[in-house]
Amino acid sequence: MSSKARRLTSEINLERLAEIYRGLGETTLPKGYWIAHVDVKDSKGYEVYRNAIAAPLSKFGAKFLIRGGSQEVPEGSCKARTVLIEFPNLRAAKLCYESHEYQKAKTIRNKYSVADVIIVEGH
């Protein structure tokens, strides 16, 4: 193999290694989460919000881990409904929240519920 061919092969291998490394970095980033505590004032209106958030959540790779259900609050106080949404990483969680699509949906949520939303990084 000529020196030019060896150099080209080395460059291709380095590119491939960089590609693999970037991929590993993406998969090893800590997950991002939205934790929401919600009091729903109008369940039919809140359903409109739930439908409106489907697209932005999907776009940013989110999945529901907790979506309502029974809960027990042994200390302090909490709203009636707890929602936990997982994102691939903290950046995706923040970008989804800041997205035009979600902000539009949030105006719907604000009409039909009162919520505390926290964005956190998991480990």
Show the residue positions of the predicted features:
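Serine residues within intrinsically disordered or low-complexity segments
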Residues: S2-S3, S10
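Compositionally biased, low-complexity segments
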Residues: A5-R6, G23
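Low-complexity, intrinsically disordered segments with a bias for serine/threonine
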Residues: R6-R7, L14
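Hydrophobic transmembrane signal anchors and adjacent membrane-proximal interface regions, especially
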Residues: R7-L8, T107
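Short S/T/G/P-rich N-terminal loop/turn motif that feeds into the first structured element of a domain
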Residues: I12-R81, F87-E98, E121-H123
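C-terminal structural segments of small proteins and small subunits
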Residues: K94-C96, Y102-I118
